[in-house]
Amino acid sequence: MEDSLLAHAVAYINEDGTFSGSSFSGAASPSLKPLIREAAKAVPDPRGPGTVYEVWLRRNKGDTTDLTLGNLGGGSDFAGFYHHLGIPAGGIGFDAPNGIYHSMYDSYDWMSRFGDPGYRSHRAGAQLVAVMAARLANAELLPYDYVAFGTELIQLVSQLDSGLARKQWTVSTQGLKDALGRFTDAARALARVRDSALAAPDSARAARANAALMQVERRLTRPEGLASRRWYRSLQFASDVDNGYATMPFPSVNEAIRYADPATAERELADLTARVDRARAALEDATAALR
């Protein structure tokens, strides 16, 4: 099964107890966040007026910078796909601060009377998942956004810098920042070529490009896993080692900082930097396939 998933799976859409209110939210690999936002523009909000995206925007007073989607932590079924195999994953839902989840009141009766009367949020959620699945399945070129991915990871390096500064170590993240900059530049080059390729479709070129794109996040995994948890192979995100639900970016480095091990932090930064460059090479392979 693992070999089949690595060879063929393009994404995993996770839906786990996510319809208990009226406020749209989601979490995903950064490469899939733009896909979720675009899907939200295509589905009517269950309470309206307008689309899910438009209601989301109004809730944030029109500030698109606040239309954030979270990063995946743990405690759900995406872990096997995302943390273990490096398959991009994401999920959406409609929630509310009701405190019912995983309680004795989490029942059909509560949901039908209070959580989602008429099951309107459930219907909108199913429509959103259908839009995402259709766009992933039918796209000439897989709709990953690696410009968004690289940009977000560059921003998250600041968390490493803060942790290193608190420890007063001389360990530098500059090599990782440079590698992520090269990655993002390669993603921008791919985006330019992608637009031209979609204007003149070529199925053989698209197949080669898609095969390369599927390797990008897989190349950010390590077969031997994290030092603390061998099953967790992804080096981009994991669940927090001290909180199974929270997310931890760059877990191999962050855990070394938490455990006060500067030599391991430096070694893990070098390993992560090399893997980012390997992921960039996959982007360059996709670009070359489309030229």
Residue ranges and their predicted role:
Residues 1-291:
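Secretory-pathway/membrane protein signature
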